Regions:
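Glycine-rich "HGGG/HGxG" loop immediately N-terminal to the catalytic nucleophile
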Residues: 128-140, 183-185
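Short beta-strand immediately N-terminal to the catalytic nucleophile in serine-hydrolase-like folds
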Residues: 174-176, 205
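N-terminal cap/lid segment of alpha/beta-hydrolase-fold proteins
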Residues: 24, 28-87
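Gly/Ala-rich beta-loop-alpha elbow adjacent to hydrolase catalytic centers
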Residues: 176-180, 184
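Bacterial N-terminal signal peptides
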Residues: 8-18
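Alpha/beta-hydrolase active-site loop
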Residues: 141-164
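Alpha/beta-hydrolase-fold enzymes
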Residues: 190-281
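Short, surface-exposed "cap/lid" segments of acyl-processing enzymes
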Residues: 83-130
Length: 281
């Protein structure tokens, strides 16, 4: 079980977007593009954030009266996280990347950064997240940017209605990363028409310029697997064996950034294997 968890954690930290590649032009300490994508930001370059901030979970009834299949009995509403300042401050809505929840690691990091900068923050899951599909998607089939934007906008309105009596807001802002970055643009366009928030600033972090091109690029990484994409199972088992053996015989107490950086220094996988791992995620 520990080995399955090990491989899962390693795969989860692999961002499937090679545009995060390191560039020698600005002195990034990890020269390889695939390696930089896998390892992420080195600890020494990470800013310090407060360990705890005033925040609470929101459960939003975005689609009142919606009849959910019995199998989703556990889903009580759309999950959202609300971080708040004591004083009047701008509010920013954060949209998660593809499939991510309202409390994904990246979203929590962004929430703390924005809180530290003086913002109220409300995080929202990706429209492709199961909780969003069940509780907030009008069509229950996500992927159409215009429809997803309308669903997100509706969720934002419900979230704001729930918290507006608790905080003072000086302006509304919007931010999304990855697929959420593209969706932020569509939400901003919708807000120009509806004028509920009149977003002061909209930040798109690493949005795909072309979703089709991004998917094609990711699939191309799979072709670097020995034997091609059809050998994914064999490749996965081989990588799992490598990672688990390294973890077993190494002096590690946790599967964390230090573990990943150690793998990088030991050159545990080839460039082609790194590309295949990114493509698999």
């Amino acid at each position: 079980m520990i080995y399955q968890r090990l491989m899962l954690v390693v795969c989860l930290v692999l961002l499937p977007l090679p545009i995060f590649a390191a560039d020698d032009g600005y002195g990034y300490p990890i020269p390889g593009s695939y390696e930089a994508t896998i390892i992420g930001t080195p600890a020494k370059l990470m800013p310090e954030f407060p360990a705890n901030i005033p925040s609470r979970k929101l459960v939003l009834d975005v689609m009142p009266g919606r009849q959910k299949p019995a199998i989703f009995f556990y889903d009580e509403g759309l999950h959202s996280t609300f971080a708040y300042q004591k004083q009047k401050a701008p509010l920013v809505f954060l949209i998660a990347g593809a499939g991510a929840s309202d409390r994904s690691a990246k979203l929590m990091t962004m929430m703390k950064a924005l809180y530290q900068a003086g913002f109220h923050v409300i995080t929202l899951p990706s429209p492709s997240n199961a909780n969003f599909i069940i509780s907030a998607s009008q069509s229950k089939v996500t992927g159409d940017m215009t429809e997803d934007a309308a669903d997100l906008y509706r969720a934002m309105e419900v979230a704001w209605k729930q918290v507006k009596g608790e905080i003072e807001v000086s302006s509304f802002n919007l931010c999304g990363y990855s697929l959420g970055g593209s969706q932020a643009a569509f939400v901003a366009k919708l807000d120009e028409e509806r004028r509920v928030f009149n977003f002061r600033k909209v930040l798109m972090i690493n949005p795909p310029v072309s979703l089709y091109s991004s998917v094609v690029s990711i699939e191309a990484l799979l072709e670097q697997i020995p034997g091609g994409a059809k050998k994914q199972g064999v490749f996965f088992n081989k990588m799992l064996s490598k990672f688990s053996q390294y973890y077993r015989y190494g002096n590690f107490v946790a599967i964390n950034d230090d573990f990943l950086y150690s793998i990088y220094k030991e050159k545990l996988f080839t460039r082609e294997e790194a590309a295949g791992l990114i493509g698999l995620t």
